[in-house]
Amino acid sequence: MKKVMLVFGTRPEAIKMCPLVKEFQKHPTEFETIVCVTGQHREMLDQVLTIFDVKPDYDLNIMKQGQDLYDVTARVLTGMRDVFKECKPDVVLVHGDTTTSTAAALAAFYQQIPVGHVEAGLRTHNIYSPWPEEMNRQITGRIATYDFAPTPLSEKNLQEEKAHGQIFVTGNTVIDALHMVVDKLKTDKALADEQINVLKNAGYDVTRLDGGKKLVLITGHRRENFGDGFISMVTAMKDLSEKYPDVDFVYPMHLNPNVRKPIHEVFGEDLTRPNFFFIEPLQYLEFVYLMEKSTVVLTDSGGIQEEAPGLGKPVLVMRDTTERPEALKSGTVHLVGTNHDLIVNEVSTLLDDAVAYEKMSKAVNPYGDGKACSRIVRALNGEAVDRYEVK
């Protein structure tokens, strides 16, 4: 039996790793499945663990007020050292591009434990965009023994870098997670009704959309956008809400003060508006429910670039670069950066032009078929694995 440890610490990681935990747990004779969380995003992480019913075996609980990247890296490195010495896993799986992933991979390397990198090979080729994520994933990629690339383009990036790890093209586990949650919401009316109540308590009455009203769903929290870029983004959102008084704009605000402060600078202390709703951060379940109800998604998130197209939603990305160019090529995503006029113009086009909207919403999602977790488990079990191909 192989002892496999999955390490993650943020909400996006948890969304993409919890389905993999559940898949490993289906094979108790082949794998002992161990879960270690770092708590890099404490409250938001715990919410996802509850949704997927995943109970960690180890919890580093590193979250502290005012911590920076130095603190996170040091705490994860030393915390994982002690966990690895006690647990002695045969392989450690980390995800993507977080500081948790890189520090955990480095800690495993120091003890010569093989590392599997889930969502390997994403690149912008600019180490400061996104920062620090681009360098994080490059470092993790150098350490990994197994590279689980979500797409053929990710595989190509790894091959060009001459990555020493064995590469498997699996699709992205976020599509597995999305399928699980959407199926739950479609088959369990009580659960769907519960999301309506949760959203209402968070500050938005989703029944406002029952008459065909359009919804622009917004998320924004990336470090590289803080400062003038974020002010420009928020100003564009304000101007759009005034230009389209019959369209609802909903922004679940990240807990980070660097996000909340510029919002108040632009909108004032009182955020109450007739068609703009600043609400508290949402758990994954209600966020997927709201995303499914949306017309357009405006975001600087990485994962949402993969998830929203799976629901047929056009995505405008408030970043200058993306490590997910497959979506640009397929037409499901457009880059708008932090440029005020470009954001306003692109959102306006999707709200006003039915042909442009249909072109984006009907484009093929290139990120997966819901079988990524199965491919990863079979790969680590030494079985033949079919290669994910973009249709």
Model regions: which residues?
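Nucleotide-activated sugar donor-binding and catalytic core shared by glycosyltransferases
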Residues: 1-251, 257-391
